[in-house]
Amino acid sequence: MKTSAIVGIILAGGTGSRLLPCTKVTNKHLLPIGEMPMIFYPLKKLVGAGITDILIVTGTEHMGDFISLLGSGKDFGCRLTYRVQDEAGGIAQALALAERFANGQPMCVILGDNIFEDSIEGMITDFTNDPDKAHIMLKEVADAERFGVAVISGDQITQIIEKPMEPPTNFAVTGIYCYPGDVFDIIKGLKPSARNELEITDVNNAYIAVSRLGFSHFKGYWSDAGTFPSLAKANELVTLSAPHF
């Protein structure tokens, strides 16, 4: 079933510095996970949820490689558009480049190094049932200090803390987000963080401040693939669960 009102955005930029020297010659999202390039996984998740109008944001150096690999999107049952991120400036800065593409429509955003088992159809349903709210996916993890961590009270997220030394919960904020079209107004009001980036955590906390952030939990596995240990883990999970892909 086509989810025509929602566009998809895959953020596949960044330097991949934690995967050097492999990323000296290619973008990390083109590295293999199981039998496919990493970028195939978020693409297939979006298409599987009926989202077929998709933007890929990546840097200048390897843009041609993405186009050579993915083309128009026809082979995947979607229509692909590409946007260059001239320099790394944070996840929210990369998302801001999608404003013209989204054109006021709601969107599902996936960080291209997130590998996960569950379908996102349930998340999309929850989002479309309450479209004024943003919606994020959480996953309980053992190493929550590596991620943004959600503080939950009842059925509400009260705060997201970015990479806390002593996490108050083990609920990591994964790189899968649904946003209404006004997310770009929020991004325009952000100030750079201490590392001089526009942080997606600040976007999500802005929605929390006005009680407009919903959430769901992943039941199956989830892994980012931005470090060698997590890349190896993602390969292991995909290999063991090959029928799901």
Model region roles, listed by residue range:
Residues 1-10, 18-21, 32, 36-110, ...:
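Conserved N-terminal catalytic core of the sugar/cofactor nucleotidyltransferase
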Residues 118-146:
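Conserved donor-nucleotide/metal-binding helix-loop-beta segment in metal-dependent transferases, i.e.
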